[in-house]
A protein has these predicted regions:
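Extracytosolic (periplasmic/ER-lumenal) interhelical loops and adjacent juxtamembrane/interface segments
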Residues: 40-74
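Terminal transmembrane helical module of multi-pass membrane proteins
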Residues: 157-247
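Membrane-proximal helix-loop-helix units in multi-pass membrane proteins
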Residues: 119-164, 168
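Individual transmembrane alpha-helix segments
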Residues: 60-98
């Protein structure tokens, strides 16, 4: 049983993050470019500062533009890579937290740690569902549904990180240094949530400046990279635990 749990908490997250990162890089390299008339921006490549990650997952480019003269290019290759990777992230997150509670029960950790791990599992399953939903509904297929999944994915992730940190804090086997890493991520995530809910709104029919766009785009990429780093830190912690337990 411990080998199965180790796979879902250590090996699978590493495999998934690697695949997702590679999918994003390839999708960005083959992205046909975009045109944002409201700020006078046009390119024939993917921009780290001017294109959202969700644009990699769109069916066509420039679907948010009102001007019908702007060409909408097919984006199927990038869409399949990015959305496929994002769905995999969601599924892995669900499997990670489904097995998260099992490890604390299996090693007979503290009663508080076991209790909070069960609550964490439920929120983790919900977060994974929302992330998979972002990939299943491209923003140009249904913008409202896509934004709903994306916003609630990050909102749920905030509460998930808090519960995860509490669970590890009460653990008799996991070092509290892993709590510090996740708490730091919670703070960064809180700042990002303020940006997406109360910052400049970017979308079809919205009026925004180039700096507004860059703020949202860079913030999005920063939180995704920080999230992957936070997960890998937890993976390392579990790997250390499993090695000690195995020995």
């Amino acid at each position: 049983m411990i080998k199965k749990i180790r796979f879902y908490l250590v090996r699978l997250p590493i495999i998934t993050i690697t695949i997702f990162f590679c999918c994003c890089v390839i999708a960005a390299l083959i992205y046909p470019g975009s045109h944002k008339e409201i700020i006078g921006y046009q390119s024939d490549y993917y921009s780290f500062t001017h294109n959202f990650l969700s644009e990699l997952g769109s069916l066509k480019t420039n679907t948010d533009e009102i001007n019908t003269a702007i060409i909408q290019k097919d984006n199927t290759p990038s869409m399949l890579l990015f959305n496929g990777g994002l769905i995999l992230i969601g599924a892995t997150l669900m499997l990670f937290y489904y097995n998260f509670k099992k490890v604390f029960a299996f090693i007979e950790d503290s009663s508080k740690s076991i209790f909070y791990s069960k609550i964490t599992m439920l929120v983790g399953l919900l977060a994974g569902f929302f992330y998979a939903g972002v990939g299943l509904v491209p923003h140009d297929l249904h913008f409202g549904a896509h934004v709903f999944f994306a916003n609630f994915a990050f909102l749920t992730l905030f509460f998930l990180c808090i519960l995860h940190s509490i669970t590890v804090y009460y653990s008799n086997f996991l070092n509290n240094s892993y709590v510090i890493g996740y708490v730091a991520f919670c703070i960064v995530l809180f700042v990002y949530l303020r940006i997406i809910f109360f910052g400049p709104q970017i979308g079809p029919g919205k009026i925004y400046s180039e700096s507004d766009l860059m703020l949202q785009v860079i913030a999005q990429k920063s939180i995704v990279l920080t999230f992957m780093a936070a997960i890998l830190q937890q993976v390392y912690g579990f790997n250390v635990l499993f090695k000690k337990y195995h020995n």
